[in-house]
């Protein structure tokens, strides 16, 4: 029987999930996105050719894989169409490989307008959203006024529902935020123009996945963002609007949680964060600049500069607990090449001198803590492109072993570069 594997980020996103998903899809029949929207950015490099995906699952470049967008994903029709056309121009037969749940909430222009207006109104207290309407679309879903892809298939009813929700949101835009209203007729026409095309790719995702499971076909679930951005378990309120953790698989795809076999946590050899929010191990110094420059730490979605820092084992322990991580994939080890020493945060010290090895439950709690570091020797040898443990310097191996000890979880895959072949698979999640 085929295994069902979850691949998700265990930090604040940008861990290198896209490459690993693409690599492992060689053994999967289905790749499923179950949360988030086009605020995610997954970068694939195949034979030096770079592809950045935001909404479509990373398995789309494989001809043996069906890609699924589950009900937990918020879909902006214009962004989806743009991504499809980009792939089709490169010869990828997207319509043959992509299936979508008609229960996906729609992101419409007024969601983006609200997102931007809110961030502007917050001033220096801005959360750091991508401005793509993700949060407002999830709000509409939870408040039960949101429109879904399936609503597009009844034009008359969709027009009525759209008028109701736009009346509400345009009032907020004009009266509270003092910005222009979004045009109803244009929003309606643009949405209905893509309705038939979307309908051709829609399916009952729950039924499809359960049928695949019973047939023994391996399924991969691709997470977006990272554990520390989870709406419930992340550094709230500096989080995304969906469940980025393993629990989101069941709610965002309709696949029963008892049928998941392995959870692969993706973790950088250091830490980055993009946008606002607490970050205890942040390096606002020359070493941070070195890591950020060498690691090319710029967001795939927004191009924003990421904030670099040392690996935070305290936060990673929380990620292991929340996701029941089976094993880790350690990425960007090569970025640490050349440093005289490397550090791992092993505790948080509070003003009264106490040291804790668990994370605070609210963002404000992070303001009090000072990271307690364990310092290890760095290495001058190059790890970039290494394909076996034997090729790694002793200090790098010691660093890996120490991470495993601190997290009580094995590192099953090591990535030493952006290309598919620059990877060591020590334990294959699908075996």
Swiss-Prot record:
Record-annotated active site: 14, 42
Name recorded for this polypeptide: Adenylosuccinate synthetase
Superkingdom, taxonomy of origin: Bacteria
Principal location: cytoplasm
Recorded catalytic activity of this chain's protein: IMP + L-aspartate + GTP = N(6)-(1,2-dicarboxyethyl)-AMP + GDP + phosphate + 2 H(+)
GO MF entry, a single one: magnesium ion binding
Localization (cell): Cytoplasm
Record-linked SUPFAM superfamilies: P-loop containing nucleoside triphosphate hydrolases
Residues the record lists as binding substrate: 300-306
Cofactor mode of binding and number, as noted: Binds 1 Mg(2+) ion per subunit.
Xref: InterPro entries: Adenylosuccin_syn_GTP-bd, Adenylosuccin_syn_Lys_AS, Adenylosuccinate_synth_dom1, Adenylosuccinate_synth_dom2, Adenylosuccinate_synth_dom3, Adenylosuccinate_synthetase, P-loop_NTPase
Cofactor(s) needed for function: Mg(2+)
EC number of the protein: 6.3.4.4
Binding site for GTP: 13-19, 41-43, 306, 332-334, 415-417
Keyword annotations from UniProtKB, A to Z: Cytoplasm, GTP-binding, Ligase, Magnesium, Metal-binding, Nucleotide-binding, Purine biosynthesis
Known pathway: Purine metabolism; AMP biosynthesis via de novo pathway; AMP from IMP: step 1/2
GO biological process, one term: IMP metabolic process
Free-text function comment from the UniProt entry: Plays an important role in the de novo pathway of purine nucleotide biosynthesis. Catalyzes the first committed step in the biosynthesis of AMP from IMP.
Binding-site residues for Mg(2+), renumbered to this chain: 14, 41
One Pfam family per UniProt: Adenylsucc_synt
GO cellular component: cytoplasm
Record text on subunit structure and interactions: Homodimer.
Residues bound to IMP: 14-17, 39-42, 130, 144, 225, 240, 304
Family classification: Belongs to the adenylosuccinate synthetase family.
């Amino acid at each position: 029987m085929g295994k069902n594997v979850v691949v998700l980020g265990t930090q604040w996103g940008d861990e290198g999930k896209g490459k690993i998903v693409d690599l492992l899809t060689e053994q999967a029949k289905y790749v499923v996105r179950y949360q988030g929207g086009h605020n995610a950015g997954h970068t694939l490099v195949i034979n030096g050719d770079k592809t950045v995906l935001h909404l479509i699952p990373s398995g789309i470049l494989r001809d043996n894989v069906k890609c699924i967008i589950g009900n937990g994903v918020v879909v902006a029709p214009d962004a989806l169409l743009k991504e499809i056309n980009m792939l089709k121009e490169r010869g990828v037969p997207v319509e043959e490989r992509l299936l979508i749940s008609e229960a996906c909430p729609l992101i419409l222009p007024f969601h983006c307008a609200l997102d931007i207006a809110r961030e502007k109104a917050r001033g220096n207290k801005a959360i750091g959203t991508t401005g793509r309407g993700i949060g407002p679309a999830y709000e509409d879903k939870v408040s039960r006024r949101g429109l879904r892809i399936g609503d597009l298939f009844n034009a008359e009813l969709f027009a009525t529902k759209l008028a109701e929700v736009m009346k509400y949101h345009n009032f907020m835009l004009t009266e509270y935020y003092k910005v222009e209203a979004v045009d109803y007729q244009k929003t309606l026409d643009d949405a209905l123009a893509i309705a038939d095309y979307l309908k051709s790719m829609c399916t009952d995702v729950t039924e499809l996945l359960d049928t695949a499971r019973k047939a023994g076909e391996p399924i991969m679930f691709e997470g977006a963002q990272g554990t520390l951005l989870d709406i419930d378990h992340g550094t709230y309120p500096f989080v995304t609007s969906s469940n980025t953790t393993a629990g989101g698989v069941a709610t965002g795809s309709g696949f029963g949680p008892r049928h998941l076999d392995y959870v692969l946590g993706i973790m950088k050899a250091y830490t980055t964060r993009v946008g606002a929010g607490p970050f205890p191990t942040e390096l606002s110094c020359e070493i941070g600049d070195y890591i950020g420059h060498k690691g090319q730490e710029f967001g795939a979605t927004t191009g924003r500069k990421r904030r670099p820092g040392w690996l935070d084992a305290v936060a990673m322990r929380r990620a292991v607990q929340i996701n029941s991580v089976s094993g880790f994939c350690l990425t960007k080890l090569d970025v640490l090449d050349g440093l005289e020493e490397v550090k791992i945060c092993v505790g948080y010290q509070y003003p009264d001198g106490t040291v804790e090895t668990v994370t605070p439950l609210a963002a404000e709690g992070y303001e009090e803590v000072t990271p307690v570091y364990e310092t290890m020797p760095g290495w001058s040898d190059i790890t970039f492109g290494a394909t076996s443990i034997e090729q790694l310097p002793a200090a790098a191996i010691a660093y890996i072993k120490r991470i495993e000890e601190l997290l009580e979880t094995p590192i099953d895959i090591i990535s030493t570069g952006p290309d598919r072949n620059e990877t060591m698979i020590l334990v294959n999640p699908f075996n």
